[in-house]
Amino acid sequence: MQADMHGKLHAALEDGFFLFPFEQQQQPNIYYDTTTDQEDRPCFSFGSTISPRSWHFEKSDKIASSQLQNLVHTQPIHLINPQILFNEEFLNLENIDSQPISKETKTTKDCTMATGPERGKKSSESTRSSSLSSLFSNDESASTFHSSFNNHDNFQKSNRNGDDIDISDTIKYETNTNAQKDIKIFQENFEFNEFPYTQDFYPYTTNYTYSKPTNIHESINSKNTDSYSQYQDQFPPHTDNIHSFNNRHYSNHKSTNCNYYNNTSNNNNASDNVYEADPFIDEPQVPSYYYPLEIAFDVEKSPPPSLQKLNSKELEFLKKLNSKLSRYAAAYSFSSSNDQDYYDKVRFQEISYKFSKTYS
């Protein structure tokens, strides 16, 4: 069946054989004049009747090719369902509005009972959507193309210029794709802070302690920080910016000499502090090279639990367990089985079950 379809497709493309009965019958020796009015030339559409205006294909001055060629060369090939191309209903779309519905009605004497939805009067838009959904095997793609057609139709009716295109009109008819659903689920499951770096990097339970620098003489007391200034160089090393991490957390240590390097005699406009005041933190800024910063986290350390003395049954169980584990390890080392992950899971479940039964 599939080979026959491919054969028909190749025959239609190479020999120019027309598979659609309602397409324009061209004579082999007659060439259409380019000056002919395009409105008189029927063109392909996914609709019921041969419309002078096609919503999908642009009009061309070239010789009109077969409708199957237009279909194959303008549609993504992976979206075309080959089983629908030669469907009887799809081949007779031009008569779908005028044909009687024999399959969906039952005539009994003088009355007619309809067993399905009425199809006698259908707009071109609904017919296009039905044929479009049957043409494409992917329902989501069909709905997207149908939405694009609605958007295009509304734009044509509004008679607006090309410069007046509103982006909202394009987005309004778009369907929800799987990617949009995944993004919505991602936003629901993971709630991120809008400003992740507004707070300090470390939690508030962090302790900030000072240690004695290694280059300080032993006779100098680390508490008397003013006496340490004579051991500093005249030009201090590079100091961090006022917004850096080290300079933001000296609020509880105000005994450090911050004004040593202020030469107020030469500069009368010098500020009281070496650093400018931080507008967000009302605390003195201290050079970070005085004392290196050591960060010690407050981890709640619970006392180690008392060791439980095992009875004879538990000791026997541990011996058997160790023997099993050693046997598993030996088997893995010799066999190098590809199912090691599976046996690891089984072994973990077995150990967990036995421990839960033993220590519950």
From Swiss-Prot:
Where is it localised? Nucleus
Give GO BP annotations, semicolon-separated: meiotic cell cycle; positive regulation of transcription by RNA polymerase II; pseudohyphal growth; regulation of meiotic nuclear division; regulation of sporulation resulting in formation of a cellular spore; regulation of transcription by RNA polymerase II; sporulation; sporulation resulting in formation of a cellular spore
What upregulates or represses it?
Starvation of yeast cells may stimulate activity of IME1 through a post-translational mechanism.
One GO CC term, this protein: nucleus
Q: Where is the composition biased (Low complexity)?
A: 126-135
Which UniProt keyword terms apply here?
Answer: Activator, Meiosis, Nucleus, Repressor, Sporulation, Transcription, Transcription regulation
Per the record, which residues fall in region Disordered? 102-135
Superkingdom is Eukaryota
Leader sequence range is none
Q: How does it assemble?
A: Interacts with UME6.
Q: What is the role of this chain? A: Transcription factor required for sporulation and for early sporulation-specific genes expression. Positive regulator of SME1/IME2 expression. Directly activates expression of SLZ1 during meiosis.
Its name, as the record gives it, is Meiosis-inducing protein 1
Q: Which gene encodes it?
A: IME1
